[in-house]
From Swiss-Prot:
Its EC number is 5.6.2.4. A motif (DEVH box) lies at residues 408-411. Residues 1-56, 739-766 are annotated as: Disordered. The lineage of its organism: Eukaryota, Viridiplantae, Streptophyta, Embryophyta, Tracheophyta. Its main location: nucleus. Residues 31-41 have a biased composition (Acidic residues). This is General transcription and DNA repair factor IIH helicase/translocase subunit XPB2. Pfam families: ERCC3_RAD25_C (PF16203), Helicase_C_3 (PF13625), ResIII (PF04851). It is an enzyme of class 5 (isomerase).
């Protein structure tokens, strides 16, 4: 699903494209791609896979926009007159790998083709359009791979009825095949009435139409077919739904489950009186993303990927307004809960008593039978003891059939803690929103069965050219380590303080201070300074006398600081820890200075860039400025000759794949800055070095955030320094205890038989 997914067709095919009859007997699409999940851009055999000299060019290849290779790679020319149509098609059937300005690279994968057929594209339509756009004759390997990946889609549905999950299919033989799998068989409930001859529940369902070749690029919504079909189904355990969906994916049984919600014909769940306001006008790319979600009068579960600042909130509110059923909206923290509640009221006609917040500080309920609840992932997934009021609210959430489960920053869902949310709540349709569909633990592909396929992904550079998001100048500022700091950095005994040493590098501090002064005084910009290292965050903020927000900052104080940053002319810089990475809306900010980060996290780099991607000024002014008119700036300060250089290169990879480039700056601060900046003298630098070395290891590490549990604010694991901590005896006391277990009653442990003791100790017990 994400950029990390590299499975694709190879030339080791079991049969040629002519043997179409065998296609009907395909059970496992794994036969069509290598078992190894390697990156095709590296490794052995690269030259062999890259040799496409046998591809046959079409006579009019100059008029066609893309190259389709036998290994599943597709290259798109962005300067082609057909670029826009080709991009809309490719983003529906393939995974983007790298999208610089002139040439895009995509991969055909089983999951991308699963997503394609889920939005209504037929197998033959995919092959036909891909062949029309390709400069070469479409390789037989790709044709076979498309057939294998899409052959079984739509044969199995996952349906929610009265808080019970059913696997439904018009083909009883398919259900038998699924039940032959141990995982699915163990998940089956056998208490259903009205069995057919095969032991399945028999019912009726309305049919549907699929998109044809002529309707592919027009995105026209098709009407639902009126024909009714006989369906067979069996019930499964709600706690095992995740396992069942995973087993049905293309890399397993290859019967990907169709999750669609026929909300217009749902007469069981009450309707929510909610419409979009007249001023809520979705942009073209927002409309396109919604058209991928809605078709045939039904809502599909899946993921929409839009850059930060591109209007994901409006997409989410629009989806909820179109379904008009109860909606559960999940965010990452209490600040974003407030922002989502505000967005619902801003863009829709929902009444104040129909929307409520559920956080550790605010436990509200909506009035009536239907409404919107905005809460955090932690509040739902928390497994500890709750207050009586919170327990009642959670129980209501568990028992309710939600029309829409709206998940912001959906890339966090694969985490063990957050994925429990999917099984705790029951919803007909799931929509995930994110800007960065990447994770360093390779769990991003789990979203295929936790949520659904990727429905749409926007191209960042296209939105920049359209003036929909800011045009950002990215720069990496190289800060040489001072002699004293570098000497301590190289010492083995300081291994736990290496990060603190290169973050607190005096030259990095001076560069940071210079950039803040330049952008505040000469440009009048609003600046965010990011630091994962809590020790550095505190030292920088106190030295420069700027407000800061970190894990232990109360919700009230956070709100006050952010409000002052947005409205006050005197508060132009704010320091943020990693709590500011996600879901904090600061549209006024247009400069980011990053002084420390979380190792090589590509997602964090993109999320932080997203804090300044909100479009600035009027659309006409942005368009008139041209692509070279930068209106936002992203600085990553790196201490040279340290581990930070390696991490910085890795972190930038996602943004480079989106078409961004990083300018390297080696002369900050300028030589004439002199003593006007802090830590100019060697005495000041040595004093700072002593402070870093004398701090405890727990004080100079990364900020560790606790779970946002019920009744407890988001806090950090931090303690005040003391002499006992310096000696290594912090929190330790002397006490005696009896390690032997006492038996029930007054009987004590019987003494050991002296004859069974070791010879050395026998004489002591004579």
């Amino acid at each position: 699903m994400g950029n990390d997914e590299r499975k694709r067709p190879t030339k080791k095919m079991k049969y040629g494209g002519k043997d179409d009859q065998k296609m009907k007997n395909i059970q496992n699409v794994e036969d069509y791609y290598d078992d190894a999940d390697e990156d095709s851009r590296d490794g052995e055999g690269e030259e062999k896979r890259r040799d496409f000299t046998d591809l046959e060019l079409k006579p009019d290849h100059g008029n066609r926009p893309l190259w389709a290779c036998a290994d599943g790679k597709i290259f798109l020319e962005t300067f082609s007159p057909l670029y826009k149509q080709a991009y809309d098609f490719l983003i529906a059937i393939a995974e983007p790998v790298c999208r610089p300005e002139s040439m895009h690279e995509y991969n055909l994968t089983p999951h991308s083709l699963y997503a394609a057929v889920s939005v209504g594209l037929e197998t033959e339509t995919i092959i036909s359009v891909l062949n029309k756009l390709s400069k070469t004759k479409l390789p037989g390997e790709i044709i076979d791979f498309i057939h294998a990946s899409t052959a079984n889609y739509g044969k199995v549905k996952l349906v929610l009825k009265k808080n019970r999950y059913f696997i439904e299919s018009p083909f009883p033989e398919v259900l038998k095949r699924l039940l032959s799998d141990d995982v699915i068989n163990r998940a089956r409930f056998t208490s259903e009435p009205y069995y057919g001859g095969d032991g399945f529940t028999i019912g009726k369902t309305s049919g549907e139409l699929e998109a044809g070749p002529g309707e592919l690029l027009n995105e026209a919504e098709l009407a639902a077919a009126a024909e009714e079909k006989e369906t067979h189904s069996f019930e499964i355990d709600p706690a095992l739904v995740e396992n069942v969906k995973q087993r049905c994916l293309p890399n397993a049984l290859n019967y990907p489950m169709l999750e669609e919600y026929d909300f217009r014909n749902d007469n069981v769940n009450p309707d929510l009186d909610m419409e979009l306001k007249p001023h809520a006008q979705p942009r073209p790319y927002q409309e396109k993303s919604l058209s991928k979600m809605f078709g045939n009068g039904r809502a599909r579960s899946g993921i929409i990927v839009l850059p930060c600042g591109a209007g994901k909130s409006l997409v989410g509110v629009s989806a909820a307004a179109r379904i008009k059923k109860s909606c559960l909206c999940l965010a990452t923290n209490a600040v974003s809960v407030d922002q989502w509640a505000y967005q619902f009221k801003l863009w829709s006609t929902i009444k104040d008593d129909q929307i409520c917040r559920f956080t550790s500080d605010s436990k509200e309920r909506f009035r009536g039978n239907a409404g919107v609840v905005v809460t955090t992932y932690n509040m739902i997934a928390f497994g500890g003891k709750r207050s009586e009021e919170a327990e009642k609210i959670i129980e209501e959430m568990r028992n309710r059939e939600w029309g829409l489960l709206l998940m912001d920053e959906v890339h966090v869902v694969p985490a063990h803690m957050f994925r429990k949310v999917i099984s705790i709540t029951k919803s007909h349709c799931k929509l995930g929103l994110t800007a960065t569909l990447v994770r360093e633990d390779e769990k991003i592909t789990d979203l295929n069965f936790l949520i659904g396929p990727k429905l749409y992904e926007a191209n960042w550079l296209d939105l920049v050219k359209g003036g929909f998001i800011a045009n950002v100048q990215c720069a990496e500022v190289w800060c040489p380590m001072t002699k004293e700091f570098f000497a301590e950095y190289l010492k083995k005994e300081n291994s736990k303080k290496k990060q603190a040493l290169y973050v607190m590098n005096p030259n990095k501090f001076r560069a940071c201070e210079f950039l803040i002064r330049f952008h505040e005084q000469q440009r009048g910009d609003k600046i965010i300074v990011f630091a994962d290292n809590l020790f550095a965050l505190t030292e920088y903020a106190m030295k420069l006398r700027k407000p800061m927000i970190y894990g232990a900052t109360s919700h009230i104080e956070r709100t006050k600081i952010l409000e002052a940053f947005k409205t006050s002319k005197t508060v132009n810089t704010v320091f943020l820890s990693k709590v500011g990475d996600n879901s904090i809306d600061i549209p006024e900010a247009n400069v980011i200075i990053q002084i420390s980060s979380h190792a090589g996290s590509r997602r964090q780099e993109a999320q932080r860039l997203g804090r300044i991607l909100r479009a600035k000024g009027k659309l006409e002014d942005r368009m008139a400025g041209g692509k070279e008119e930068y209106n936002a700036f992203f600085y990553s300060l790196v201490s040279t000759d340290t581990q930070e250089m390696y991490y910085s290169t890795k972190r930038q990879q996602f943004l480079i794949d989106q078409g961004y480039s990083f300018k390297v700056i080696t002369s900050l601060p300028p030589p004439d800055a002199g003593s006007s900046l802090g830590y100019h003298s060697q005495e000041e630098q040595l004093s700072l070095l002593g402070k870093v070395l004398n701090a405890g290891d727990d004080m100079v590490g990364l900020e560790q955030l606790e779970e946002d549990t019920d009744g407890k604010a988001l806090k950090t694991r931090r303690s005040m320094g003391s002499m006992s901590a310096m000696s290594g005896a912090n929190g330790r006391v002397y006490m005696e205890y009896n390690s032997g277990r006492q038996k029930s009653g007054n009987q004590s442990k019987k003494p050991k038989d002296p004859t069974k003791r070791h010879n050395i100790f026998k004489k002591r017990y004579v």
